[in-house]
Amino acid sequence: MSYSPVNLFDLTGKSALITGSTKGIGKAIAEQFAAHGARVTISSRKPGPCEEVAGAINAKHGDGTAIACPANISSKEDLQRLVNETNAAFGKIDIVVCNAASNPYSGPMAGIQDEQFLKILSNNIISNNWLIQMVAPQMQERKDGSVIIVSSIGGLRASICSVSRASPSPKRPESQRGASSAS
């Protein structure tokens, strides 16, 4: 396929799993992916909002464009179910968008409680690692796929969440480490 402005964003035949996709940035990503031809998995903790967003996308782009799959990102079992249901519905996962996150604390590092810090690590780092580990093998086998990790403007002002968003990843080139904290 040749690339032109017309087909540069054509996602026909692609499937995307998007965490935190019932509102805000995640919902906008899901809507735009569907508008460009992708099939999308809508996911957040609560079933109602997942069904609502998937229903709206299906109403606009046709039945089967979106599925709803509630999942708690802090649960490895929920994430595996999310991957399994997406694979069952669409046959493969081409794009993973790690958008869901939490920030139970905003303030100086000296004031954060252990439970809050552990929740940030679990939801903002460990869950992304699990999800990528679950999906990467099929992408590597096909030699095709994309992983997108959404960050926040929280990196513009130092907080404990900035630490989790800027932490190095062995799979990222040195030049990209920490770049996500400013997005």
Indicate where each model-derived feature is located.
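Residue(s) in the substrate-gating loop at a strand-loop-helix junction
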Residues: S152
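Flexible N-terminal pre-Rossmann segment of NAD(P)-dependent oxidoreductases
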Residues: M1-L17
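Conserved glycine-rich cofactor-binding loop
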Residues: S15, T22-K23
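Substrate-binding pocket helix/loop in short-chain dehydrogenase/reductase
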Residues: G107-M109, Q113-L121
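The beta1-alpha1 cofactor-binding region of Rossmann-like NAD(H)/NADP(H)-dependent oxidoreductases
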Residues: P47-G48, P70-L82, D114
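Conserved glycine-rich Rossmann-like NAD(P)H-binding loop of the short-chain dehydrogenase/reductase
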Residues: H36-V53
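A short, exposed helix-loop element centered on a Lys and neighboring polar residues
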Residues: I132-Q133
